[in-house]
Amino acid sequence: MNVKTLRVEKIGGTSMSRFPEIIDNIILRNPDDIFGRIYIVSAYGGITNDLLEHKKTGKPGIYQLFREQENYPRKMLELRDRLFELNQSLVPTGLDLEEANDFIGDHIDLAINILRSMDNVLASGYVSRKALLLAARELLASLGEMHSAFNSANILRNRGYDSTFVDLSGWEDGRQLTIDERIKESFKDIDPFSTICFATGYTKGTEGIMREFDRGYSEVTFSKVAVLLGASEAIIHKEYHLCSGDPLIIGEDKIHPVCNTNFDVADQLADVGMEAIHPKASKPLEINNIPIRLKSAFDPDHSGTLITKDFIAPRSKVEIVTGSDKVASLEIHDTRMVGEVGFDLRIMQILAKHQISYISKATNANTIAMIIADRDSTPELLADLGDKFELVTSTPVAIVCAIGSNIGQPGILAKAAQSLAADNINILAVSQTPRQTNMQFIVNRSQFAQAQRALHGALCM
């Protein structure tokens, strides 16, 4: 008996910008495997950066103009023209240009009117500025996903396939639905085994998907759709494989796809900013025993990397070497610390006040050192800590990690340390828990890439 299995698949923005290849490599690759797949799509590459702010550099987008009450309507119209050009480029792929331009053009005009109304309400001073700005941010974010999802369904329909645009953005829908309720409501009359579904990566809900997840919202939508609809597998299509190291640092010829790992390893990666998937999106999948498959959209013959709950590598090995050079070592030295119960609790309370989570922590009799993100090492934090403790310093450093589902073998830590020493790299601090999934080395920032190459060469080759 042929049992129908549903897969929910996320396609990122960079991949969406190469949509003709996505059609060939993913959507229509196997004529016998077209349906039973729901695609959660991001905006085309760079569009959400223009709408909100650049994800990496922080360069302001339209949202910032609205927040500062500058000329956002002009920028919205410039963006509309850019989207019209993008639509034009998709005509050879099958896009109906008139329908596509009417759709996004109407939504941009409506968005400008809504933002103007918000502007007037903000000026009145009668409502919470924070709440209204969040609503404006979500409104803008939704435009990018609506555009790409509508276009995708339109293209497939014009190529002769039954396809459905699933709009989770809640535009012109005044019902007060939670995110889960909107997903259920939107899919209740859709049979994904008879139509190709393209759903927006943004979902409108009373709790505000960006309030907690901000730019990670599309992965949260992806996760929730997979759980609520009972998917057998959740697939993420990226422009690259999840590999044993960064090809730009280690070299393309020296790395390899991971192929299999577990959710614990995925958590370790997220902790240093190398997100295989947003940790708050992966948890519901892990709890519901839905495996995640990470695939390269442009290497369709490779099965990708499967992340499951219980996978343990059959032989002990390091699966990934990664890290971050955008971290600081926050060090608190205090002679009163020795033997005092709860001393570090006071430090944690100050970090919690500033909403800071640390990546790694090392202690001795009178010193506690934590690795935190550079952006969190603020003068305000240091001043608060300095008021309570004897000596507080913050030093720019790098963290390099050797991670695997099965690295608990005698000598592996020594081998890692020796590889760094052989390359004249001084270890400033080292950390590993008895669970033995992540060896963390703190090194001088200038030796970040060098340390990764040394560890990868010793542990992953």
Where are these regions (language model features)?
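Short glycine/serine/threonine/alanine-rich loop segments
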Residues: 161, 231-232, 290, 356, ...
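A conserved active-site cap/scaffold subdomain adjacent to cofactor or substrate pockets
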Residues: 262-336
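Conserved H-loop
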Residues: 42, 297, 363
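Positions that flank functional sites
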Residues: 171, 241-242, 300, 366, ...
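Short hydrophobic alpha-helical runs that function as membrane-insertion/retention elements
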Residues: 233-237, 292-294, 359-360
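A conserved regulatory-domain signal marking ACT and ACT-like small-molecule sensing domains
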Residues: 303-461
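Nucleotide/pyrophosphate-binding catalytic subdomain
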Residues: 1-277, 282, 442-444
